[in-house]
Amino acid sequence: MDRAIQSPGKYVQGADALQRLGDYLKPLADSWLVIADKFVLGFAEDTIRQSLSKAGLAMDIVAFNGECSQGEVDRLCQLATQNGRSAIVGIGGGKTLDTAKAVAFFQKVPVAVAPTIASTDAPCSALSVLYTDEGEFDRYLMLPTNPALVVVDTAIVARAPARLLAAGIGDALATWFEARAASRSSAATMAGGPATQTALNLARFCYDTLLEEGEKAMLAVQAQVVTPALERIVEANTYLSGVGFESGGVAAAHAVHNGLTAVAETHHFYHGEKVAFGVLVQLALENASNAEMQEVMSLCHAVGLPITLAQLDITEDIPTKMRAVAELACAPGETIHNMPGGVTVEQVYGALLVADQLGQHFLEF
């Protein structure tokens, strides 16, 4: 079977990179629709406008309405068509970037993204998640290509809430363990076919970077400063994890995250916070070594990620709720079926309870 790997056309990262955005956009197109968070425009609109103007680029800067819905995509497509814009750039959080990618897909033009937080690995992916105008999940929009350009301004990331960086570490934490599991079962990745050795090595390097730099990066972002550790964690959260999950494979950890959405108490937690607990559940499913479990729990605890159900605000009626989580995690088509040998609802239910107990024991010592 053929193997494949995919990634953005170009990845740029550095302090104050947004000031140089126009230079990076210029080779792609000379007329841009800029879609940005209202919050981002509040502190960066002048920087964006000056950067593109200095590069000789025409632009319209529009505020994202807050929901990545088909209605919002259609509105922005109409603006791009009316003004003859030949490329799209999204600046802000995940929904803004997903919207920009979707608009570019329907307009059949290049897309660039500039994430202002490092809370997930989504910016580099060939995927947009669409919701209804009311905020309910609608569908996945699988895109034919990854963004042509990803630009991350680490000075902006450093000023974002520290919890967002921790959530990105939680999302990135799954990359190696899910890629390892998917590789063992020869599961097809989003790139097509089993993982390449390059993708697996990127996934492993992502995990090693989190272990080495995670706690130091959290201290940096708490102080709102850019350090070498923060630079490396931003790259791990955004690029290494982005390429790693898409071309390395996904397995139980993200399926457990999806299962946890069945429990109302978890709805206010970030994606990566729930994924981090999903990693512990996957390791319990795999009967991972005590050393590996301790290593993962130590990292999670150091950066403020949950390792028990109580830390996800699940404290009552646990057996019933975990049964619902296990059933949803094992739904047909879920990525948990990429686990070697397959898994059952009973096995996932047991792993959820064991992971919680392991986390509790860790916190006692």
Curated annotation (Swiss-Prot):
It comes from the Bacteria. It holds the Pfam family Fe-ADH. Pathway: Polyol metabolism; glycerol fermentation; glycerone phosphate from glycerol (oxidative route): step 1/2. The keyword Ribosomal protein does not apply. Its cofactor is Zn(2+). It catalyses: glycerol + NAD(+) = dihydroxyacetone + NADH + H(+). Its EC number is 1.1.1.6. It is an enzyme of class 1 (oxidoreductase). One of its GO terms (cellular component) is cytosol. Keywords: Glycerol metabolism, Metal-binding, NAD, Oxidoreductase, Plasmid, Zinc. GO terms for biological process: anaerobic glycerol catabolic process. GO terms for molecular function: glycerol dehydrogenase (NAD+) activity; metal ion binding. Binds 1 zinc ion per subunit. SUPFAM superfamilies: Dehydroquinate synthase-like. Zn(2+) binds at residues 171, 254, 271. Glycerol binds at residues 121, 254. NAD(+) binds at residues 37, 94-95, 116, 119, 125, 127, 131. The keyword Plastid does not apply. Catalyzes the NAD-dependent oxidation of glycerol to dihydroxyacetone (glycerone). Allows microorganisms to utilize glycerol as a source of carbon under anaerobic conditions. Belongs to the iron-containing alcohol dehydrogenase family. PANTHER family: GLYCEROL DEHYDROGENASE, GLYCEROL DEHYDROGENASE 1. This is Glycerol dehydrogenase. It comes from Pseudomonas putida. The gene is gldA.
